[in-house]
Amino acid sequence: MAAAMSSSCCASSLRLIPFKRTLFSSIHYPAKTLLLRPLKPSEVPSFRRTIITFQKISTGIVPPPSASSSPSSYGDLQPIEELPPKLQEIVKLFQSVQEPKAKYEQLMFYGKNLTPLDSQFKTRENKVEGCVSQVWVRAFFDEERNVVYEADSDSVLTKGLAALLVKGLSGRPVPEILRITPDFAVLLGLQQSLSPSRNNGLLNMLKLMQKKALHLEVKGEEDSSSGESSESSFVSIPETKDEANVPEVDLESKPDLVEDLGTEKIDDSESGSNVVALGSRGMRIREKLEKELDPVELEVEDVSYQHAGHAAVRGSAGDDGETHFNLRIVSDAFQGKSLVKRHRLIYDLLQDELKSGLHALSIVAKTPAEV
């Protein structure tokens, strides 16, 4: 009996052992087969080849951004065509040079060839603030009321930057100079050649030059208020320009400036033949001002015929040669604004016309209370 039980237990245990071995063996065997990787070696090189192929494709995409000399690659920056002609030439010259060192050497060349500024003009008023080196800029009108600049610096490199601006801006009318935005510095591609402080110095020079041009324009308007008739140039201020740099004109302290600017009338009885009906540009100007300013009084007078000797005569600038206008606007929109800011508002509204052949405006901008 005991033997039978013993054999039974043994048999039972013997049956369990093979079962357990079989169980673990069956579990372990597939694990061993999973460790066999007959396909892995062939797959890995294929995967790596895919990565290499992708890298080669991405490498081919890199060159277009480096071809930054193309104006179209600058996106929303100010178009080169809006810059003064000489400044356009300089920008294109720098864009054609890929090596930063070559651009640096060109600046040095400009600096060495810049005519020194007379010491009497190296004053605090002419000094550019925020530059690493000392820089002075002087501005004055030539006989045709174009701005002429002179500059100097105690650093050859900074002198080169000043010379670049003097060369690019001199001989141009005030509106062209004031339309320039800081974008032109990006178009030059000098970021790799100059330190951040030098780049900021270049922009500070531009701001002072624009400020001086605006001062000349305002002074010219003050002189014209003496009663002498003279050609009036428009004042346009770029949006990127800091308002802190724009001189304010107190209307109360200078009433004659508002009263006499561009108010010369044409006597219909004596000069009826000179009265010009508004053409397409004149009508657009009138409609724009009526819509945006809701004026109490609005006069738009085409005086382009008075400037027959000007570069833009009738028929040469599109819109039947409509290039010069007298504007008289009485509107509540001018309330609390200085003369300069009133001009700025008007020219912001007429930007499309300014870009398409409008050369000059004589503006009288008043509030109803000032009439």
Curated annotation (Swiss-Prot):
Q: Where are its TM segments located?
A: none
**Impact noted for substituting residue 131 to S:** Loss of function
Q: Per its UniProt record, what Gene3D superfamilies does this chain match?
A: 3.90.1010.10, BolA-like
What GO CC terms are in its UniProt record? Answer: chloroplast; chloroplast stroma; cytosol; mitochondrion
Pathway named in the protein's UniProt entry: Cofactor biosynthesis; iron-sulfur cluster biosynthesis
Expressed, tissue-wise, as follows:
Expressed in roots, leaves, stems and flowers.
Q: Chief subcellular site?
A: plastid
Q: What happens when the gene is disrupted?
A: Embryonic lethality when homozygous.
* InterPro entries on file: BolA (IPR002634), BolA-like_sf (IPR036065), Fe-S_metab-assoc_dom (IPR003808)
Q: Where is the transit peptide?
A: 1-66
List the Pfam families. Answer: BolA, SufE
Active-site residue numbers: 131 (cysteine persulfide intermediate)
Quote the subcellular location field of this record: Plastid, Chloroplast stroma; Mitochondrion
**Summary of the function given for this chain in its UniProt record:** Participates in cysteine desulfurization mediated by NFS2 in chloroplast and NIFS1 in mitochondrion. Activates the cysteine desulfurase activity of NFS2. Cysteine desulfurization mobilizes sulfur from L-cysteine to yield L-alanine and supplies the inorganic sulfur for iron-sulfur (Fe-S) cluster formation. Glutaredoxins regulate SUFE1 activity by inducing its reduction and deglutathionylation.
Subunit info here reads: Heterotetramer with NFS2. Interacts with NFS2 and NIFS1. Interacts in vitro with GRXS14, GRXS15, GRXS16 and GRXS17, but not with GRXC5. Interacts in vivo only with GRXS14 and GRXS16.
Q: Which family does it belong to?
A: Belongs to the SufE family.
Please share what else the UniProt entry notes about this protein: Over-expression of SUFE1 leads to retarded growth and chlorosis.
Q: What is this protein called?
A: SufE-like protein 1, chloroplastic/mitochondrial
